[in-house]
Design a protein with these regions (language model features):
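Bacterial N-terminal signal peptides that target proteins for export
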Residues: 1-8
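Disordered, low-complexity segments in secreted/periplasmic proteins that are enriched in proline
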Residues: 21-50
Length: 501
């Protein structure tokens, strides 16, 4: 009975109490903006509720996260007690479940990845998990959830994006109940998938105590599963590597006990991430003790191309923060920071070959470090200039055709999404929108690093971005999250919407 209660509390249930939703405002065409001030429950798509502490029990039996959707398959990562028998049943019609996977028995407490294959493309599926605990004769069915296979070109769809969640910074820029509300709001919008922009698994604080690395890093990833197992049961997740994950080349030392290896393996263990195949392109190189990194990748969906970049696994130096180091970012030689030749050539080929009308590029931040958006774009391998203004791209990146920004301009990238700065900022440079994505659970509602932004629409935390992709235009909506209370500043509740053609 206790296990069943845990399952009900934390498995695939989407709880919509404590949330308020309204009809989304219609954005004007032609790239114009529309701002709407939220007014309590019913204003601006906000997530409301009481600031009650969230109970974080161990990951519940049946906790499920979806990933790696294709035109014919999807992968479910499921936590099950050892000896539990289970299967997934599904159908294109709600409540019918005419198809099912083979039964499987959990061999350990670690998540199991189950491939749901031979699906129809451009289709919505409804599914539920059924499982039978050891020494039990009855199967337990989870609530119904859903997913979509690849949308064909010309079909409208939506996706979501959140910035750095930083669950280790509770009281400073994270509140567990606000995070839950944001994720519940995401599920209610029903995007086809959801991007997390990095700094969701902070490993920095464990670097000074190697004896704690494995258990501590495992705990960081388990913590996110407790939240994402609810929301993630609907939209599949795509992760972007951040600086605080410390999944980084500079830490490699040839052993299987260093932080980068442990973090890289935990990332793949707890979340189903894309590897190069017939549907996804990406990083084909392997790292000793980790294998495929699954760090950068690309795919097409509907009228759009999605590209995820990563400098951390490909730079010989610490890209951003190196715990214990007193070196300031401004004194670093950022020509040493790179996505590497292989990733650059892959990016160039991917952008040039795609015929998608809309192209979206994701990275934790411009160059993986610093603050600001378009303010950072002119420099180093991103824009070609050194800090003194000298154009030195050819000297430092021989063989590269163009700096990354110019490559995006030439290939008509629609939006570049980044996290890291803990702020909402929409800017434009040479026709490319630079979109900084806000924290999803900052109950202080601060516009961190605002001073680094000299242009654009700037708003404080918190919430997520809901992006609707149509045949002719893209609509981006900043869906705000806050607790229902009095005297909130307008900039805390203001919903920002813009369109791109």
């Amino acid at each position: 009975m206790r296990m069943y209660r845990l399952f009900i509390a934390a498995c695939l249930i989407l709880t919509f109490s404590n949330i308020g939703f309204t009809q989304q405002p219609k954005a004007r065409r032609g790239g114009q903006e529309q701002n709407t001030k939220g007014k309590g429950r019913g204003g601006g798509g906000q997530a409301m509720g009481s600031a009650k502490k969230m109970n974080l029990d161990p990951i519940a039996n049946g906790n499920c996260v979806m990933g790696m959707p294709t035109d014919h398959s999807i992968t479910a990562s499921i936590v099950l007690e050892k000896g539990t028998e289970a299967y997934v049943e599904y159908s294109t019609k709600s409540g019918e479940y005419k198809q099912r996977t083979s039964s499987f028995v959990a061999g350990a407490e670690s998540p199991m990845e189950i491939l749901i294959n031979n699906l129809s493309s451009n289709s919505q599926y409804f599914y539920r998990l059924k499982y039978k605990l050891p020494n039990s004769t009855a199967f337990i069915a989870t609530n119904e959830s859903w997913f979509s296979t690849q949308k064909k070109s010309g079909t409208s769809f939506s996706f979501g994006v959140q910035g750095d969640s930083h669950p280790e910074r509770e009281g400073k820029m994270f509140h567990p109940m606000l995070y839950k509300q944001t994720l519940d709001s995401v599920a209610a919008y029903k995007p086809d998938f959801y991007f997390m922009m990095g700094d969701d698994f902070n490993i920095d604080r464990f670097l000074s105590n190697p004896s704690l690395n494995k258990s501590a890093i495992k705990g960081s990833y388990q913590l996110q599963r407790k939240y994402l197992g609810n929301m993630g049961a609907n939209p599949p997740l795509f992760l972007v590597n951040g600086n605080h994950e410390q999944s980084a080349k500079y830490l490699l030392d040839g052993t299987d006990t260093n932080v980068a290896v442990i973090a890289g393996n935990a990332r793949k263990k707890y979340f189903p991430l894309p590897a190069p195949d017939a549907f996804y392109s990406g990083d084909k190189d392997t790292v000793e003790h980790v294998g495929l990194l699954k760090d950068y990748y690309a795919f097409e969906w509907g009228n759009a191309l999605f590209v995820v970049l990563d400098p951390y696994w490909h730079s010989d130096v610490a890209v951003d923060n190196q715990p214990g180091s007193q070196e300031k970012q401004g004194k670093k030689d950022q020509w040493k920071i790179t996505i590497g030749d292989a990733q650059y050539n892959w990016l160039k080929t991917t952008l040039e070959k795609s015929k998608a009308k809309f192209k979206f590029v994701f990275a934790h931040h411009v160059m993986g470090t610093g603050r600001g958006g378009v303010e950072r774009a002119p420099f180093f391998e991103w824009g070609g200039k050194s800090p003194n203004g000298a154009q030195q791209f050819g000297q430092y990146r021989p063989g590269w055709a163009l700096p990354i920004h110019q490559l995006m301009v030439k290939n008509k990238v629609t939006i570049f999404f980044q996290g890291h700065d803990h702020i909402y900022a929409q800017q434009s440079l040479d026709g490319v929108i630079y979109q900084s994505v806000p924290n999803p659970a900052d109950d202080t509602h601060t516009a961190f690093n605002k001073e680094a932004y000299t242009s654009g629409k700037i708003l404080p935390n918190s919430g997520f971005l809901h992006v609707s992709v149509g045949q002719k235009e893209v609509k981006v909506e900043y869906v705000r999250s806050y607790f229902k209370q009095e005297n909130l500043a307008q900039e805390t509740t203001e919903r920002h919407v813009y369109t791109v053609k």
